[in-house]
Amino acid sequence: MARRKSRYSGIGGQAVLEGVMMKNKEKYAVAVRKPDGEIDVEVETYQGLAHGSRIKELPFIRGIFNFLDSLLLGTRALNYSASFYEEEDSKETKFDKAMDKMSGGNGEKLLSGIVTVISVVLAVGLFIVLPYFISSLFESFIRNRSLMAIIEGVIRIALFLLYVWGISAMKDIRRLYQYHGAEHKCINCIEKGRPLTVHNVMHSSRLHKRCGTSFIFFVMLVSIVLFFFIQVDNVAEKVILRILLMPVVAGISYEIIRLAGRTDNIFIKILSAPGMWIQRMTTKEPDESMAEVAIASVEAVFDWKKYLQDTFGYEVDESWMKDEASAEPED
C-alpha cells in the first residue's frame, strides 16, 4: 500500500508511569495500566496559563506559555499515574495536609507547581549554567569568542545526550521510554490515515517531529545562536543574561517545532533530523499491552474515526480496518 502523507491532528501527549497522557485542546486523558492489569482512564480539562488572553496567541510569546503548560500538566499527569503504585496503606502526611491548607484544598496542584519550578531551576542549572562554566575552562588558551560560544553549545548538547543515555539504564525509565514510543506510534498511526488498532499502532513509527525531545534539541540549537551575541566580560552578567534569555529561546524553539509539525518539505526534514535521531534514545519499541494503554488515552479525548473521515475522506468500517492491518510497517 502506498505511504500516505502525514496530516496534522492537533493531539499531543507524553509518557507517564506505566501509561500515557494525551491532550486534545482543553481536554486531556491519563491512561494507566494498574498493578492488577486493568487500564484506568482519567479525563480532565486543563485550560492553561493565561487562558482566554490574546497574548497566548501571539507568535513567540505563545511558546513560553505552552512550554510552562506542558511542564505543569506533565507533572500533574505523572503524579496521578504514580498514585497507583504507592503503598496501599500510605496515609496522608503532615506535609500533604499543609499543602492542602495553603492551597485551599488544591494541594496536588500546588505540589505540581512547586515540582515544576524546581525542575526548571535544575534544568537551567545543568544544561545552561554548567556548560558555560565548563567551557570557561578553555578561556585561558582560546581567545576567540565565537569559538567559545560553539564550544559551550557542544558541551551543552553533550551533557544532554549523556543525561538521556545515563537514565535509560534504569528499568523504570526504559519502560517510560517504551510508553513514549507507544504515544508517538498512536499519533503517527492517526496522522498517516490508519485506523487506531493495536496492529496498526505497532507498525507505525515511534519517532515524531513534534516530540518534546526535538523541542529540547531546538532549545539547545537556538541557545547557541543567541548566546553567541552575549558580548560581556563579567561572569555574573553572562550567567544572568543566559537565564533571562531562556524564555526567548523557548519561544523561538516552539515556533520552529510548530512549523515542523505542520510542514513536510526537505528543509524541515533536515532541520528535524537531529531531534529525530535523539528520539531513538528517548523512545523504545513498546509491546502490545502498552499500545492498548496509549490507544485508550487517545480515544478518551479524540474522535479518530471522525478525523479520518474529515481529513482523508473515508469512513472506517471493519473490512477497511482488516485491509489496513496488512499495511507495511513504517521505518
Where in this protein do the model-derived segments appear?
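Divalent-cation
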Residues: 1-86
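Cytosolic juxtamembrane amphipathic/interface segments immediately preceding
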Residues: 2-10, 15-16, 51-57, 97-112, ...
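Polar-ligand-bearing catalytic/cofactor-coordination segments
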Residues: 2-12, 16, 20-22, 142, ...
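Multi-pass alpha-helical transmembrane bundle typical of ion/small-solute transporters
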Residues: 46-47, 51-54, 64-67, 71-92, ...
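Juxtamembrane "helix exit" motif at the C-terminal ends of alpha-helical transmembrane segments
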Residues: 80, 84, 119-144, 219-250, ...
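Hydrophobic transmembrane alpha-helix segments characteristic of membrane transport
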Residues: 86-108, 112, 125-148
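Residue-level signature of transmembrane alpha-helical entry/exit and packing/kink sites
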Residues: 108, 112, 116, 148-156, ...
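Select subsegments of transmembrane alpha-helices in polytopic membrane proteins
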Residues: 111-127, 208-219
